[in-house]
Swiss-Prot record:
Pfam families: Met_asp_mut_E
Catalytic function, reaction form: (2S,3S)-3-methyl-L-aspartate = L-glutamate
Name of the protein this chain belongs to: Glutamate mutase epsilon subunit
Listed cofactors: adenosylcob(III)alamin
Organism this protein belongs to: Halobacterium salinarum (strain ATCC 700922 / JCM 11081 / NRC-1)
Database matches in NCBIfam families: MthylAspMut_E
Disulphide bridges: none
Top-level EC class: isomerase
Biological function: Catalyzes the carbon skeleton rearrangement of L-glutamate to L-threo-3-methylaspartate ((2S,3S)-3-methylaspartate).
Pathway(s) the chain acts in: Amino-acid degradation; L-glutamate degradation via mesaconate pathway; acetate and pyruvate from L-glutamate: step 1/4
Binding site for L-glutamate: 62, 96, 145-146, 167, 173, 177
GO biological process terms on file: anaerobic glutamate catabolic process; glutamate catabolic process via L-citramalate
Residues engaged in binding adenosylcob(III)alamin: 64, 119, 176, 289, 318, 322
Length: 476
């Protein structure tokens, strides 16, 4: 059974030897050479330092295209025209599935046709030197954003290539993405990723790690999301990671979102070791977007307002073309500017929201209950407890494609749009918390004159793309 135990240097080296060879040579990811490259980078390209010294909310988009020059130009555009403080490199789907041969074919077609035949940057195929070229040619810190359950080779290549932040984790890049891996396997894979990050950190190169807070991106209750990213932060800390950015996906109700990010920061400070610097990220709305770009800007603006009120360390922005596919560089930059405009205007105001403290207390109590259940299931071992808690359903997520989660929890919005649980499954929440959730949902049912049912959930899933927050009867 998996244990929350730090890999030894010998184990780290053995895994690196095992995963390299076919697509990347062992020599290409030479650790001493990689550390020297990181040390050559100027301070403004050091991701953790920029995060941890930020005096205002930082903005970061999502972006990635297959050809290296085009990818660099895209990032430069987002920096210069969008004002991005931090830059992404979003990895293509084939690489996420470890299908490097297919990624190579897509990259070759992209070069032949002068077009994008992949939906991201195939970092493994570009290799360490290709990654270093990206880092050299842009003028801001760059993060690897992907969705890879087995990210070991991707981490080895991109970290040797000069990237200093790596998104994801064994839960957040398993349960929402795939049915191919059990949780114990991905925890083992990510122990390598985190230990590699820890090894760099011990040599003076701080690598930031960021659990993916939005999970399935669909009505995820804040307490569940926060418990899971906290677990991933704890697993990373065991392996020597010292910079952790806890992530949360906006649900759309201002009070609940502000309360959730504050709760996440408080829980992170409470549970993670003092040796770890904890920062936070708010992901703008991850659900369906309106097709009308003006309305899409409205969704982005609300997220910007949320970020202004709660002041996470950074906000991951969206574009007004989310509903139609991969956004253009111009659209992506527009989403950054919309967010920045709202942040700047609200920075000059003092706004207090009623009910935040009460909601934050409810969220924190729920998170502690979930984490207690994990520790109890693992007899104090967070890795073992995570596997057992998901097996038992005491920790769960809604709408998982993975068999590693029961998927027995069902969320719905209450009468002012906060995400509650309609079905609890076996999730480890106390009776009083369940009563609060049910009472809030009953109030909505009374308002709408209908029974609590899955129809309400389905209406909520499509509400934002239809121009509302709550899926009321007759809105279509």
């Amino acid at each position: 059974m998996i244990e929350d135990k730090r890999l030894t240097d010998t184990e780290l080296e053995a895994i690196t030897d095992r995963i390299t060879g076919d697509w990347v040579s062992r020599a290409a990811v030479d650790f001493a050479d990689a550390v020297a490259f990181h040390e050559s980078l100027p301070p403004h390209k050091r991701f953790a330092a920029v995060l941890e010294n930020a005096e205002a909310v930082l903005c970061q988009p999502r972006a990635g295209v297959p050809r290296l020059d085009e990818h660099v130009e895209l990032l430069q555009h987002l920096d210069e025209e969008g004002g991005a403080d931090l830059l992404p490199t979003t990895i293509d789907s084939y690489t996420r599935d470890n299908a490097y041969e297919k990624a190579a074919e897509g990259l070759a077609r992209s070069r032949e046709t002068d077009s994008s035949e992949l939906n991201g940057f195939p970092a493994v195929n570009h290799g360490v030197e290709g990654c270093r070229e990206v880092v050299r040619r842009v003028d801001a810190p760059v993060q690897v954003r992907h969705g890879t359950p087995d990210a070991r080779l991707l981490a080895a290549v991109t970290l040797a290539g000069g990237f200093q932040s790596f998104e994801g984790g064994p839960i957040t890049y398993n349960l929402p993405y795939t049915s191919a891996y059990d949780l114990e396997t991905t925890i083992e894979y990510w122990q390598y990723v985190d230990r590699l990050c820890g090894a760099y950190t011990e040599r003076g190169v701080t690598i930031n790690r960021e659990p993916f807070g939005p999970l399935t991106g669909t009505l995820v209750p804040p307490s569940i999301a926060i418990a899971i990213v906290t677990i991933e932060g704890l697993l990373a800390a065991t392996q020597g990671v010292r910079s952790v950015t806890l992530g949360y996906g906006q649900v759309g109700n201002l009070v609940q979102d502000v309360a959730a990010v504050r709760a996440m920061a408080a829980i992170g400070a409470e549970y993670l070791p003092d040796s770890v610097t904890v920062t936070t990220v708010l992901h703008q709305w991850m659900g369906g977007f309106p097709r009308d770009e003006a309305r899409a800007h409205g969704v982005i603006g609300l997220a910007g307002a949320t970020a202004a009120l709660v002041e996470p360390t950074k906000v991951i922005t969206k574009s007004p073309q989310e509903a139609v596919g991969v956004p253009t560089a111009e659209s992506n930059a527009a989403g950054l500017r919309t967010t920045d405009q709202v942040l700047r205007m609200l920075d000059e105001q003092s706004i207090t929201l009623d009910g935040v403290d009460r909601e934050q207390a409810l969220i924190e109590r729920s998170v502690r209950s979930l984490l207690d259940a994990v520790y109890e299931a693992g007899d104090g071992d967070i890795a073992r407890g995570t596997v057992r808690a998901f097996d038992a359903g005491t920790l769960d997520i809604p709408f998982p494609p993975s068999d590693a989660a029961a998927g027995d929890v069902l969320p719905a919005r209450d009468d002012d749009g906060r995400v509650r649980l309609l079905k609890f499954g076996a999730v480890a929440l106390d009776d009083e918390t369940k009563r609060i959730h049910r009472a809030r949902l009953d109030r909505r049912a009374d308002t709408e004159g209908r029974e609590l049912s899955f129809r309400m959930v389905a209406d909520d899933v499509s509400a934002v793309s239809d121009g509302r927050l709550i899926g009321r009867p007759g809105d279509d």
